[in-house]
């Protein structure tokens, strides 16, 4: 079965992609009759060296994303994973020569088709009297023994674009640029890993992987790698990659050792999430610095992809200060990252958080008995939420993410850990404030924010008094804050529905009289739980569920169910203690 792609046609997808890039970038223009993109200011290059690169499409943003001042002059693109036509390469060489450039350097990845086609175009151009040189980049560190075809050209090619571009912008001649980038190309290596393959438009995936396998040392055309290893943590996979790349017994290794200075590239092969990319980058930095390697610059993003392949490649380039200045040189290329020109290693990566303000004395602080009662209440709430994790997750799946139970369990475990560390504050106001901060930090998601808002606001009326009227006012304040910032109202199918129903029952506490808790408990719980159950017949008016068709929402809202369960746990403990 072929994979789905958002294209107009399989045959025209490479042309359409290049046209889209040029349409949105005024600094680029197409060469009529060819799949070639050039700088739109070619006339400004008179007397300088032109830089041309390219290859098959499907590696975006490479290579056309790196056209610009300080990088490439132009790019010749082939069909997906197919070398560009000789005629188009020659047309690009002629175009930059006619603009008054003093020579052209072809930067070519080491693949047979690219070498042949760029090489043939070079020979034809030279026969016409155009000075043209060619550098073939092979930075693949996958193979431990030398292959006749040499090392494949991978993401390190982009660094060659950058170095050559900086030299050309500085007015360096063709021969010197060729010699210098040839040296640089030998001082780097790249290794890729992927969780699965990719698929050319109109075709099936290029290879199959088991659910517990990853492919190591693969190229950028969907071809299989050199080794399949078992799925592991990001740290373990990164360690495997970097150990392989720097192993001196590997003929294609990068000779990195303690004290070396490197540029690190963490390259998304197309389908990896940026969350995963950040985790990989962190693992790579920690691994290298743990070996005493200085990371002069770290470039993280998508530089050379393989369509939608969910994988990553790591590139290491050994650098000194002169080379680093070329990496840092200004460029207008759209796909080059605008990173700070400072070393990654040795930089302070965190700063102390502001100190919490001292707590004001609380006149409502109660005795030890009340504190123990609060512990029992919180313990029951935690046990209740942990027991509901699977049920709440199941209810939440209708809204898309299915993590309501997990979120509430995370809150419960955070509270349990907090209770083990120290007894809770005796003051109700301070207790609610502390719980608010804890949930905001540990619970996460909109639920954590809403509970945090509720508890922060509810704490305010309890600073002066803790009688029944104050607790009713606290409930009102919490509900008001949730409505103000959460933009929810009763009837919107949220946790507010359960809490609102309970709040209406608590209005009776504002009237003078005896302890009404035993009388209220049954009615309060019945109303709160009925309100939670009623949410299954409501159309969501707030929260993530509001974006889901009401036809799919035929179960109670998980937040409302959780809130009702919390109320039951609280009131049952208080009633059992005779509060």
From Swiss-Prot:
PROSITE patterns: DHAK, DHAL. Optimum pH is 7. Detected in kidney (at protein level). The keyword Lyase applies. It holds the Pfam family Dak1. Manganese or cobalt are requested for FAD-AMP lyase activity. One of its GO terms (molecular function) is metal ion binding. The keyword rRNA-binding does not apply. Residues 372-572 form the DhaL domain. It catalyses: dihydroxyacetone + ATP = dihydroxyacetone phosphate + ADP + H(+); D-glyceraldehyde + ATP = D-glyceraldehyde 3-phosphate + ADP + H(+); FAD = riboflavin cyclic-4',5'-phosphate + AMP + H(+). Optimum temperature is 60 degrees Celsius. DhaK and DhaL domains have differential roles, individually DhaK is inactive and DhaL displays cyclase but not kinase activity. Homodimer. Interacts with IFIH1 (via the CARD domains), the interaction is inhibited by viral infection. This is Triokinase/FMN cyclase. The gene is TKFC.
């Amino acid at each position: 079965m072929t994979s789905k792609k958002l294209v107009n046609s399989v045959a025209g997808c490479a042309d359409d992609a290049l046209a889209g890039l040029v349409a949105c970038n005024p600094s680029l223009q197409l060469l009529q009759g060819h799949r070639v993109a050039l700088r739109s200011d070619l006339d400004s290059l008179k007397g300088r060296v032109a830089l041309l690169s390219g290859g098959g499409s499907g590696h975006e943003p490479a290579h056309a994303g790196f056209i610009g001042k300080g990088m490439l002059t132009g790019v010749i693109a082939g069909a997906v994973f197919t070398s560009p036509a000789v005629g188009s390469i020659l047309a690009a060489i002629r175009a930059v020569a006619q603009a008054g450039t003093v020579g052209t350097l072809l930067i070519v990845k080491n693949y047979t088709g690219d070498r042949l086609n760029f090489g043939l175009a070079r020979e034809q151009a030279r026969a016409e009297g155009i000075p043209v040189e060619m550098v073939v980049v092979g930075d693949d560190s996958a193979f431990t023994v030398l292959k006749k075809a040499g090392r494949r050209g991978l993401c390190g090619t982009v660094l060659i674009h950058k170095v050559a571009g900086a030299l050309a912008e500085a007015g360096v001649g063709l021969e010197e640029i060729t010699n210098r980038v040839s040296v640089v190309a030998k001082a780097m290596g790249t290794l890729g890993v992927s969780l699965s393959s990719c698929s050319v438009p109109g075709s099936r995936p290029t290879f199959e992987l088991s659910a517990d396998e990853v492919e190591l040392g693969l190229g950028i055309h969907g071809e299989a790698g050199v080794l399949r290893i078992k799925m592991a943590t990001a740290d373990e996979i990164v360690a495997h990659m970097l150990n392989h790349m720097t192993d001196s017994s590997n003929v294609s290794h990068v000779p990195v050792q303690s004290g070396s200075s490197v540029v690190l590239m963490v390259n998304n092969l197309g389908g990896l999430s940026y969350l995963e990319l950040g985790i990989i980058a962190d693992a790579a930095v920690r691994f290298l610095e743990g070996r005493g390697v200085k990371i002069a610059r770290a470039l993280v993003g998508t530089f050379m992809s393989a369509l939608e392949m969910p994988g990553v490649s790591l590139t290491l380039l050994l650098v000194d200060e002169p080379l680093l200045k070329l990496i840092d040189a200004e460029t207008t290329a759209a796909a080059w990252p605008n990173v700070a020109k400072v070393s990654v290693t040795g930089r302070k990566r965190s700063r102390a958080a502001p100190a919490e303000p001292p707590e004001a004395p609380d006149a409502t602080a109660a005795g030890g008995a009340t504190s123990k009662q609060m512990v029992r209440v919180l313990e029951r709430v935690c046990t209740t939420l942990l027991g509901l994790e699977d049920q709440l997750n199941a209810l939440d799946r209708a809204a898309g993410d299915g993590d309501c139970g997990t979120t509430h369990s995370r809150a419960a475990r955070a509270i349990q850990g907090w209770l083990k560390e120290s007894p809770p504050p005796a003051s109700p106001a301070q207790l609610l404030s502390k719980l608010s901060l804890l949930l905001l930090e540990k619970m996460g998601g909109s639920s954590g924010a809403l509970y945090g808002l509720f508890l922060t606001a509810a704490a305010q009326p309890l600073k002066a008094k803790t009688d029944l009227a104050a607790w009713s006012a606290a409930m009102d304040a919490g509900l008001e804050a949730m409505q103000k910032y959460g933009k929810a109202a009763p009837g919107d199918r949220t946790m507010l529905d359960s809490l609102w129903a309970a709040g209406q029952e608590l209005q009776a506490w504002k009237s003078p009289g005896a302890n009404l808790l035993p009388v209220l408990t049954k009615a309060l719980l019945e109303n709160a739980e009925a309100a939670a159950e009623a949410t299954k017949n409501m159309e969501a008016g707030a929260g993530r569920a509001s974006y889901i068709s009401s036809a799919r929402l035929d179960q109670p809202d998980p937040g409302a169910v959780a809130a009702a369960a919390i109320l039951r746990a609280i009131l049952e403990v208080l009633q059992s203690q005779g509060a």
